[in-house]
């Protein structure tokens, strides 16, 4: 996967994981938030994973990175949101593998682009099963709309640009 920072410059995955490892080793307070969104464009779907870091480490207080892929369009809503959820879990798992941290030290939160409000969103009927899925992968911190800003705002923004 190719990663970019907020100004759309390329950044290497190893640089991201090295900085996270350093932040944890040095004892900086932090939270890592991962969210994924997708957008249908013609016969394709653009899928964006946002990796956000909130920390008290200088120059890393509030940063985010994103990765984008194109794939065939999804055939239905559940396929789309379950794929987005799996992508977020995949990145969280990669962080566990590639950093010196334990799961407790990583402090990961997964943001899902689903709603718990039945009146407002078609995705609400899937929210409890997707939350359970994330928790089954040992990620207990899960947010849904309106609190899932990493997916609903940051990843969403980059599904619409041309990079």
Which residue ranges define each predicted feature?
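A short acidic (Asp/Glu
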Residues: 43-47, 119-127, 153-156
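Acidic, metal-ligating active-site segments
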Residues: 34-35, 39-64
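Basic, amphipathic N-terminal segments that precede the first structured/catalytic domain
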Residues: 1-40, 104
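Acidic helix/loop or adjacent segment enriched in Glu/Asp that either coordinates divalent metal
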Residues: 70-106
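C-terminal functional segments of enzyme domains
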Residues: 143-163
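Catalytic phosphate/metal-binding cores of nucleic-acid and nucleotide-processing enzymes, i.e., regions
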Residues: 75, 136, 160
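Short glycine-rich or small-residue beta-strand-to-loop segments that form or flank ligand, phosphate
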Residues: 33-36, 109-115
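Short, low-complexity, polybasic intrinsically disordered segments
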Residues: 112-147
């Amino acid at each position: 996967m190719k990663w970019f920072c907020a100004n759309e410059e390329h950044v290497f995955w190893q640089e991201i994981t090295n900085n996270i490892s350093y932040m944890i080793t040095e004892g900086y307070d932090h939270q890592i938030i991962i969210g994924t969104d997708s957008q249908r464009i013609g016969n394709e779907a653009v899928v964006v994973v946002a990796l956000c870091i909130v920390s008290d480490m200088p120059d890393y207080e509030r940063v985010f990175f994103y990765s984008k892929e194109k794939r065939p369009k999804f055939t239905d809503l559940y396929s789309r949101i379950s794929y987005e959820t799996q992508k977020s879990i995949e990145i969280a798992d990669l962080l566990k593998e590639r950093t010196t941290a334990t799961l407790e030290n990583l402090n990961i939160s997964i943001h899902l682009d689903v709603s718990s409000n039945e009146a407002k969103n078609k995705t609400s009927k899937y929210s409890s099963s997707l939350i359970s899925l994330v928790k089954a992968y040992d990620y207990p911190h899960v947010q849904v709309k309106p609190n899932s800003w990493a997916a609903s705002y940051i990843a969403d923004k980059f599904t619409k640009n041309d990079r």
